[in-house]
Amino acid sequence: IGVIVSDISNKFFADIARCIENHAYKHKYTVLFGSTDENPQKLENLVEVFRNKGIDGLIVVPCEGADEIIRDIARQNIPLVLLDREVPDLEVSSVVLNNRRAGYETTEALIRRGFTRIEMISYSMGLSNIREREEGYRRCMQAHEMGENAVIHHLRHDKFAKIEEIIREARQRRVEAFLFATNTLAGQGLSAIFRNGWRVPQDFAIACFDTNEAFDIYKTAIAYVRQPIERFGTEALDLLIKSIEQRDKPGSCTRIVLTPEIVESAPEEALRSAEEAAVKS
């Protein structure tokens, strides 16, 4: 089985990959891994390499600009399951998170703590999961009559230097909190906050997706989304094995939408953990 993610070193994907590998072993499958680094050419090359190695099926995290590559895999009747992200108007089995709900509820957690000037830092990529998180953020701000305060800053996935400029400018506008669209962005953002001598959550409160070991963001944040890693891995592999076994009898596709768990920290815990993280940085 071939598993292609955006970055195998990212904790979220690394943990899912491990779950897939463990589950595949029980079914007597060997797993090959690859990373695209959000580059569609790398995805295309990996698909070709894996095909030459005789893989039975693929689990793929689509990257921006790779829609036609994914469609071509499907046209060739290669058993395929999409993970974490989807391709518009393509009948392929997938396992995804309810990202709109996650974006909404993490924003709402900040609002419940009394924050009104909440902005989001996201990627400029048109990925389904990122856009849905942004939509959830916007909907929540509008539902709480804070739509005029809703601002989304977009960064390229390989251009993190701008995040410091964004946070400095936001400080001048008295922004109170940030929602980060990914754990990588949260790590970069927290580093920028500490470099400038600001404190979390006294100067900026944060909410984010997943955990980031470098700064214990999950303890520092007001709220974070804990994604069901085990279910991502097992559900994706189960769907793929089913597709492999029924390869000669194409059937309907299955879309599994997982429910996010929103974890909120106690105010005193967030404060204590942030102070510890600042010292470490």
Where are these regions (language model features)?
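Amphipathic helical "hinge" segments at domain boundaries
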Residues: I1-V49, K53-G57, E135-R138
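Periplasmic-binding protein-like
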Residues: V3, I55-P62, E119-S122, H153, ...
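Short, solvent-exposed amphipathic alpha-helices that sit
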Residues: F12-K26, A102-A109, S128-G147, Q188, ...
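Short beta-strand elements in bilobed, periplasmic/extracellular small-molecule ligand-binding domains
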Residues: A24-S35, E119-M120, R138-F160
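Flexible loop/hinge segments that line or gate small-molecule binding clefts
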Residues: E38, V60-E105, T184, D210-I222
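Hydrophobic alpha-helical segments within soluble ligand-binding/sensing domains
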Residues: S93-M120, E135, R139, K159-R168, ...
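Flexible loop/turn connectors
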Residues: V95, I166-K280
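An alpha-beta-alpha
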Residues: Y104-E145, P250-P267
